[in-house]
């Protein structure tokens, strides 16, 4: 986080903690419903009605999703999260992911300058007011959260990496391998995010006549 945040670390820490506590509480208190039970049922069907962890049952679950739903990694992770992960643990993980989304978005907006408390608050408020969290898609449900929040964070990370490489700042080997892994996860996690991102990157490459750095 060095260089990312402004010098007013106390106020920034309070805002970050508030974001995490609010979303962790919201996710923890929100009951499972709708598609949570659908993927729950798919795992039970694939595992002969047993809720217990089973490699063969999970492989059957993944196979059925691949054949009859899609190859989306988020859906493949849904049953393990819903059935086996403590709800409080997932609520905390989800809250950290959401906080990282706000920090990443603020960092992209601010360029190379540190993120100030005011900017982070502004990004947070804009997301609350402008994004459709209040509609009927129930984005705080466990399976919907898996579909959208990790995908958003992975997409922002990939955009940041592409921008950094495109501006001539390359990654060293170890970090570049990590970026490749993140880009791969971005591609397989949710096609609703990865396909538009791929289209945008393709347009950028075409406008530059594909004269991009090798890492790009």
Region roles according to the model:
Residues 1-22:
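Start-transfer (signal-anchor) and selected internal transmembrane alpha helices
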Residues 22-67, 79-80, 148:
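Extracytoplasmic loop-helix module adjacent to an early transmembrane segment
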Residues 84-100:
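Loop-to-helix entry region of an early transmembrane alpha helix in multi-pass inner-membrane enzymes
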Residues 95-114, 157:
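Transmembrane-helix motifs of polytopic, lipid-linked glycan transferases
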Residues 118-163, 190:
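Membrane-interface micro-motifs in multi-pass membrane enzymes
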Residues 164-184, 213-216:
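Short hydrophobic alpha-helices at membrane interfaces in multi-pass membrane enzymes
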Residues 175-191, 197, 202:
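Membrane-interface alpha helices of multi-pass inner-membrane proteins
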Residues 196-216:
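Perimembrane helix-loop-helix junctions
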């Amino acid at each position: 986080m060095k260089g990312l945040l402004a010098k007013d670390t106390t106020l920034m820490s309070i805002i970050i903690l508030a974001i995490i506590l609010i979303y962790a509480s919201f996710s923890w208190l929100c009951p499972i419903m709708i598609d949570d039970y659908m993927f729950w049922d798919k795992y039970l069907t694939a595992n002969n009605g047993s809720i217990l962890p089973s490699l063969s049952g999970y492989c059957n679950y993944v196979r059925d999703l691949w054949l009859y739903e899609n190859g989306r990694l988020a859906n493949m992770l849904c049953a393990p999260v819903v059935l086996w992960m403590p709800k409080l643990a997932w609520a905390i993980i989800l809250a950290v992911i959401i906080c990282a989304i706000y920090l990443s978005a603020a960092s992209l907006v601010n360029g190379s300058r540190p993120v100030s408390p005011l900017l982070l608050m502004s990004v947070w408020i804009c997301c609350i007011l402008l994004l459709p969290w209040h509609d009927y898609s129930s984005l705080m449900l466990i399976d919907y959260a898996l579909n959208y929040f990790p995908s958003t964070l992975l997409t922002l990370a990939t955009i940041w990496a592409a921008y950094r490489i495109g501006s001539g700042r390359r990654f060293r080997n170890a970090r570049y391998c990590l970026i490749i892994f993140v880009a791969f996860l971005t591609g397989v996690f949710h096609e609703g995010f990865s396909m538009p991102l791929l289209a945008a990157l393709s347009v950028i490459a075409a406008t530059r006549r594909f004269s991009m750095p090798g890492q790009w």
